[in-house]
């Protein structure tokens, strides 16, 4: 495998992956507030920003407070994604001071699609299927809820909104063992960039270690290559990161979601 310039990968990520892709999901709106993009209408508000927000001190505090107060008025939570190399470096402390709570950091990994693409190898009795119908999306949400022990019912509406806006912008896969979903995952294509985001990879505990997550990576990488995309992006959990590294992905930074939840 050829040496990879991780600095160049990071530069591509910063240039191309800071903002959401292509078509806006049904029911969602994008609003600009100075340097940041406010994503409104999903199950939770989201803030996306360039590497350098471009404001500091009291001005930054006011920017943060406006986002919190905007979503508080809607009775909704909001998340702000911060990468380890972002500026200003005190943004996390200022988010916490405004009432945001950090989640566990994820490792941002990039892979070269052509190197990762392969024929997916599945255990006996497991079938890989592409889905887009509402009933299948509800099953995916139930599967995610079961695995993570959290209410993931919003996943069905989120996926349906993306499919309804532009079905070519997302590929949703399920690995089925009989009438059970053993693993679920999807790809979000970023038109006009080199990137496909690999999302949602979730496997039932008793199916882990049997190659389903690897098969999902391989299948999605193959389609990325077929569609002309060069790079794969994952915000990886501690469980997923080692698998992705073995598949040739490269760490470029970490990302942390800072969550604000309205008082009850």
Give the label of every model feature segment.
Residues 1-70, 87, 154:
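N-terminal charged segments
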Residues 152-206:
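A conserved beta-strand-loop-helix scaffold within acyl/acetyltransferase catalytic domains
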Residues 60-68, 199-205, 209-222, 226, ...:
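Conserved acetyl-CoA-binding loop-helix of GNAT-fold acetyltransferases
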Residues 41-50, 103, 189-198, 208:
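A conserved beta-turn-beta hairpin within the catalytic core of GNAT-like acetyltransferases
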Residues 1-19, 52, 57, 106-109, ...:
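Short amphipathic alpha-helix that is part of the acyltransferase structural core
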Residues 58-136, 234, 240, 256-260:
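Acyl-donor-binding surface of acyltransferase catalytic domains
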Residues 29-34, 87-101, 169-185:
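Conserved beta-hairpin
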Residues 95, 244, 249:
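Conserved active-site tyrosine of GNAT-family acetyltransferases
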């Amino acid at each position: 495998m050829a040496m990879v310039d991780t600095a160049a990968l990071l530069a591509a990520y910063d240039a191309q992956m800071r903002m959401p892709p292509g078509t806006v999901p049904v029911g969602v709106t994008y609003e600009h507030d100075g340097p940041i993009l406010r994503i409104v209408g999903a199950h939770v508000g989201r803030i996306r920003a360039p590497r350098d927000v471009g404001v500091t001190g009291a001005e930054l505090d006011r920017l943060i407070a406006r986002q919190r107060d905007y979503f508080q008025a809607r009775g909704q939570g909001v998340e702000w994604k911060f990468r380890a190399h972002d500026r200003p470096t005190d943004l996390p402390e200022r988010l916490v001071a405004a009432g945001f709570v950090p989640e566990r950091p994820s490792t941002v990994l990039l892979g070269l699609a052509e190197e990762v693409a392969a024929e997916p190898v599945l255990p006996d009795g497991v079938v890989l299927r592409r889905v887009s119908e509402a009933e299948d999306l509800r099953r995916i949400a139930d599967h995610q809820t079961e695995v993570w022990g959290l209410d993931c019912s919003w996943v069905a509406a989120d996926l349906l909104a993306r499919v309804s806006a532009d079905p070519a912008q997302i590929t949703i896969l399920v690995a089925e063992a009989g009438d059970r979903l053993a693993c679920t995952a999807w790809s979000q294509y970023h038109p006009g960039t080199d990137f496909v985001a690999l999302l949602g990879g979730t496997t039932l505990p008793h199916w882990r270690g049997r190659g389903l997550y690897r098969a999902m990576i391989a299948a999605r990488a193959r389609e990325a290559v077929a569609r002309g995309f060069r790079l794969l992006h994952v915000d990886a959990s501690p469980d997923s990161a080692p698998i992705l590294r073995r598949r040739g992905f490269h760490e470029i930074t970490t990302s942390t979601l800072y969550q604000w939840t309205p008082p009850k």
